Amino acid sequence: MYLEAFLDYLKLERNYSAHTILAYNADIQTFFNFLQEEYQIDNPKLVEYVFIRAYVVHLSTRELSHRSINRKIASIKAYFKFLQKVGKIQISPLLKHKSLKIKKEIQIPFSPSEVNQVIENLSKSDAFEGKRDYVIISIFYALGIRRSELINIKISDIDFSSHVIKVLGKRNKERLIPMIKWLEGLIEEYISLRARTWGSNHSPYLLLTNKGDKLYETFVYRVIIRYFSEVSQKTKISPHILRHTFATHLLNNGADLNAVKELLGHSSLAATQVYTHSSIAELGKVYKNAHPRNLKN
């Protein structure tokens, strides 16, 4: 199947994270399991587009969202594109495949009062767990980083003299993000408590679980759910919403879109615009203050 060669390509040439590579591997393995069961095919050279369509129908019967199906098919498409690139097949069976349409959802950020309430509640804790959760949420809100970026922050990535944190983004791209004084002081307090709890040399990673291990994605997700479900009525709560909140609150307070783009680690301005969302009240304020007819009254 040349799968190992493809996974090595993702790791060595595309600099994909281990988590992403595992997802690609699972998607491709599941696809070929389907082909083996339904058509007794295990050779990628025998795969035709009709089998791709059949697999899409199969995934649809499992009540997966169009977004999830598209992601799985994208993994398979990348695999066949690689096979074509290295000369194992002449043409990809997904060459003319079109993704399923996705209903666009407006992601509503948390309000400043919701974020402030969570931060206020957590600021009262002196225990390791509460202080760590306080730092997790504060870093998300103050820096707008991704969940994977937060998990991989090392103590050595924090430069208190220059007031910046180094984060490792997608495809191992590094960027420096300035720290505001409030966050800097909070992290210093946490590091001191962490040293008293686990010892100074216990782990290179800044944030640890209750057992002293490196954080993992589900753990971080649960932390966000736990605290924001207490103050928000939103049906969708996630670390990504906090990243969205970071961008929106900066823009609503006059930050330049290009500056926010750099802080988020986006390569294009279009990607940043997806994260922005002004409230109706904010839009109304801008509209009333800017419209020529309103200025005359």
Please provide the spans of the model-predicted regions.
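Conserved catalytic core of the tyrosine transesterase superfamily
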Residues: 1-297
